[in-house]
Amino acid sequence: MSEIPSDLKYIETHQWVRVDADGTATVGITDFAQEQLGDVVYIGVPEMGATVNGGEEAGVAESVKSASDVFSPVTGEVIEINEKLEDEPEIVNEDPYGDGWMFKVKLADEGELEGLMDAAAYAEHVAAEE
């Protein structure tokens, strides 16, 4: 069974978001997503200063067996990217909810979080796909 932390919000395309008190939203792919991909060999993230839109493509995760678009759960300006992933994309496999985060966004609208899944809803979504 995939790990699904309870302090995060999720979208159906298997990305997660953690929002800090200052409105910074950290985005990554879920444990389920990295398991489905297999060994990740490349992570593409949006450029610094770019605007990402909730539910829209913002990057890519490529593995030895497939490639998958990465969608942003929230809308906002990209304020940080995880540069470690450029040389060590396998961190996404090893620690998808920690050091394997992909990018950080200055959240444009906290109300957007209301439409995202909590851990229980995401667990049901994953169970339906397994």
From Swiss-Prot:
Look up keyword S-adenosyl-L-methionine and say if it applies.
no
Record's keyword terms, sorted: Lipoyl
Q: Cofactor note, please?
A: Binds 1 lipoyl cofactor covalently.
One GO BP: glycine decarboxylation via glycine cleavage system
How it assembles, according to the record, is:
The glycine cleavage system is composed of four proteins: P, T, L and H.
Task: Give residue ranges for domain Lipoyl-binding.
Answer: 24-106
Q: Which Pfam families match?
A: GCV_H
**Entry-annotated residues carrying N6-lipoyllysine:** K65
Q: Is Protein transport among this UniProt entry's keywords?
A: no
Query: What is the name of this protein?
Result: Glycine cleavage system H protein
Q: What does this protein do?
A: The glycine cleavage system catalyzes the degradation of glycine. The H protein shuttles the methylamine group of glycine from the P protein to the T protein.
Name any cofactors this protein relies on. Answer: (R)-lipoate
GO CC entries: cytosol; glycine cleavage complex
Q: Which family does it belong to?
A: Belongs to the GcvH family.
The protein's organism comes out as Marinobacter nauticus (strain ATCC 700491 / DSM 11845 / VT8)
